[in-house]
């Protein structure tokens, strides 16, 4: 026979998850494109729209610098950046990250090596909450300005939200790891 306390615990856990999920999705439909001017841009690889947004921002600021984090091994600048007006010397390709946690660590090293105080972070709306959690905890003294791109596909978006919410919960454990290692 199942213990009554265990059933109550499972019920509380389920309700907590539902509340957490509602909180997670509550900010997704807001316009969260930053209007801050920063000379530094970080884009996490993923959708093509992320790179297009990064190209547009770097073209608006002749002094801007760009890190593309999470680039697959062997991929060259010319395969990623389609705009001929972008100076390759202003773009760094990060080949070490394999996850959002890895993107945060890769960016932390790049920020430290380049004495950067702030940057615009570009990723999709469904990914931003987790990315900001990891990036801000990896670099607490750096100002990070989110530049969220709206997801286009509704069915893909609905599927991703549940998966992304679970990853967001797991990211909290990664934050604990960051705290212990800093």
Question: PLM ranges: what are they?
Answer:
Residues 5-23:
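Hydrophobic membrane-insertion alpha-helices, especially the h-region
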């Amino acid at each position: 026979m199942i213990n009554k306390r265990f059933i109550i615990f499972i019920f509380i856990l389920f309700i907590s998850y539902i509340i957490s999920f509602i909180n997670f999705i509550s900010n997704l439909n807001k316009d969260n494109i930053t209007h801050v001017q920063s000379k530094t841009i970080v884009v996490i690889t993923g959708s093509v729209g992320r790179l297009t947004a990064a190209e547009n921002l770097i073209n608006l600021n002749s002094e801007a610098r760009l890190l593309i984090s999470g680039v697959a091994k062997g991929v060259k600048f010319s395969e990623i950046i389609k705009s001929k007006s972008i100076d390759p010397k202003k773009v760094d390709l990060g080949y070490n990250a394999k996850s959002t946690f890895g993107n945060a660590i890769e960016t932390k090293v790049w920020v430290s090596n380049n004495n950067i105080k702030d940057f615009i972070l570009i990723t999709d709306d469904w990914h931003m909450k987790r990315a900001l959690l990891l990036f801000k905890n990896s670099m607490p003294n750096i100002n990070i300005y989110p530049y969220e791109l709206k997801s286009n596909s509704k069915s893909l978006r609905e599927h991703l939200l549940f998966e992304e919410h679970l990853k967001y919960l797991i990211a909290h454990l990664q934050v604990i790891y960051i705290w212990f290692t800093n």
